[in-house]
A protein has these predicted regions:
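Residues that define the transmembrane beta-barrel architecture of outer-membrane proteins
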Residues: 1, 23-28, 81-85, 92, ...
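Outer-membrane beta-barrel strand-turn architecture
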Residues: 2-3, 36-40, 92-95, 149-152, ...
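Extracellular loop and loop/strand-boundary signature of outer-membrane beta-barrel proteins
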Residues: 12-20, 71-75, 128-132, 174-178, ...
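Outer-membrane beta-barrel proteins
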Residues: 18-21, 43, 55-60, 107-113, ...
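Surface-exposed beta-loop-beta
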Residues: 117-214
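Detector for outer-membrane/organellar transmembrane beta-barrel domains
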Residues: 198-253
Length: 253
């Protein structure tokens, strides 16, 4: 067949003697991809399986990163992600890169158990998660992303429709635990990065419609790097970012 084929298999395992919820197995990647295909001057790649996809440019929070679910039992910084089943079609041409994602299965967020640290005052019982969609974790999500560069500016713009990766946490009827509730959302996201010498100027912004409301959130800032400080191999970077979320403090967690 035309083009090149590749496969990836990256398992992950964690055992915790104190917290049973933190003991888990996962496939971070397990996919087959066919790249180098060509159609009417366009370069095409098809990927089928489980993969991790990262979107974003800022450091303090990744607002636009929505494909993969957070593996919260690994770390509070939400950098660790669960593998996401997907079909990904990528089309590259001189006008930019277009990615289409079909996400046929939803991964629930992991939470520490009763004996886990760190956790909320009430433990989260994610075994009893609830969904807005009647399809629950079988709901098929969809995402479309365009990315390109214009001079020194890198741009990413996407639309996502499906199950929100961030659950609302509701107090269970017994009053002793929290239950995750996953809404259906429509989300538009934008990420920009302007590179000039040692400066990086960054912006991430989203508009999300779901849970009977629409809201906008953004994070913007800069990063400056001093290279080879005192003629050494060390670099020093300075970072400043500002976060904004127009939701009120009374919104449910």
């Amino acid at each position: 067949a035309e083009g090149d084929q590749r496969a990836s298999f990256i398992p992950f395992a964690r055992w915790d003697e104190n917290d049973d919820e933190r003991t888990h197995l996962d496939l971070r990647e397990a996919y087959w991809a066919h790249e180098g295909l060509s159609y009417k001057g366009m370069d095409i790649e098809l990927l089928i399986g489980i993969n991790k996809v990262f979107w974003g440019v800022t450091e303090s929070v990744h607002l636009v990163d929505i494909i993969n679910q957070t593996d919260l039992v690994e770390d509070l910084d939400q950098e660790d992600k669960l593998g996401q089943p997907m079909v990904n079609l990528a089309v590259q041409k001189d006008w930019g890169l277009l990615n289409v994602y079909i996400l046929p299965y939803f991964r629930e967020r992991t939470f520490p158990g009763v004996d886990g640290r760190f956790r909320a005052p009430l433990p989260v019982n994610w075994d009893d998660a609830e969904y807005e969609s009647g399809d629950k974790d079988k709901h098929v999500d969809f995402a479309l992303r365009y990315s390109h560069y214009f001079g020194d500016v890198d741009v990413g713009l996407y639309y996502f429709r499906g199950t929100n990766r961030e659950p609302r946490l509701e107090v269970a009827p017994n009053g002793r635990e929290l239950t995750p509730f996953y809404d259906q959302v429509d989300q538009v996201g934008l990420d920009l990065q302007y590179t000039k010498d040692a400066w990086l100027w960054k912006l991430e912004a989203i508009v999300r419609d779901g849970y009977d409301e629409s809201f906008m959130a953004s994070v913007a800032g800069f990063e400056y790097t001093f290279y080879q400080v005192y003629e050494s191999d060390a670099d020093i970077g300075f970072l400043m970012e500002y976060q904004y979320d127009e939701r009120s403090s009374r919104e449910p967690a």
